[in-house]
Amino acid sequence: MLILTWNCQGAFRRKAQQIAQFMPDIAVIQECESPAKLRWAKGVTPPSDFVWFGENSSKGVGIFSWTKWTFTIDPSHDPSIHHCIPVIATSGADEGAGDKVNLLAIWASGHKQKELSYVGQVYRAVEQYHDFVRQRPTFVLGDWNSNAIWDRERKVNNH
């Protein structure tokens, strides 16, 4: 199984072929444009399934598969926790068939509520999705944008 995560820093439409060549089972792409902006070059296999979340079409989190994996957003999803998305990944073509794993796809970024910026989002997501991550095997992956050297204020949801 090939799982990868990458902060593409925008303009995924110009970089997507770099990921497609590996045909990953699961790819979590941060700062990813809306898939509606993607155009696949001749000879490049497009993803077989994807979900995408973002506040605008320029940057969000994209979760893609180039194999048999399909994605469903878990009902516990809380849109107020920006860019921390609980996803059920299922292998196999039939709904409900095959193996399942959970993904918590993360792109920690700025937020208008200071306490929810960067690591604050991740902290809140871990609390909110506690039951989700314990349901079945789970991958928590993405860009945490987290480093203690950036902490200027000590707060509960910090390093």
Task: Describe each model-derived feature in a short phrase.
Residues 32-110:
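Structured beta-strand-rich core segments of catalytic domains in phosphoester-bond hydrolases
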Residues 22, 95-98, 131-136:
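Glycine-rich phosphate-binding loop signature in dinucleotide/nucleotide-binding domains
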Residues 12-14, 35-38, 111-113, 147-151:
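Short catalytic/ligand-binding loop motif for oxyanion handling, primarily in non-cytosolic enzymes
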Residues 73-74, 104-123, 148-154:
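Surface-exposed cleft-lining segments at the edges of enzyme active sites
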Residues 7-11, 79, 114-128:
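Soluble or luminal CAZymes and related metallo-dependent hydrolases
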Residues 1-9, 98-112, 141:
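Active-site-proximal beta-strand elements of phosphoester/diester hydrolases
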Residues 1-44, 53-55:
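N-terminal, active-site-proximal structural segment of metallo-dependent hydrolase catalytic domains
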Residues 120-159:
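Metal-dependent phosphoesterases centered on the DNase I-like endonuclease/exonuclease/phosphatase
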